[in-house]
Amino acid sequence: MSEGGIKVRVFDMKHGLTEYENVKTVKIVSKDYNLLIMKDYLSVIGEIVGSVDIKGEDVDVSFNGIKAFYMNNKNVFNLMIEE
């Protein structure tokens, strides 16, 4: 992994797998909690009913009104979108 940020992998049935490099932050706003994931964040797994914003130098992507599952481990954030 490069020292610039984290790697984000987004998978959904419509677009398949999309990968983003050098991401600075992943902001999760779910019905029960808010979470901001950055480089070297602890390992975490969970479910999202809400939105995810992915921001970096070359990327600014938002997923709104989704139901998804996520896992963050060793500076790789995986997002599996169900709806």
Question: Where in this protein do the model-derived segments appear?
Answer:
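N-terminal export/targeting signal detector
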Residues: M1-K7, F11
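Compact, glycine-rich, soluble single-domain proteins
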Residues: R9-E83
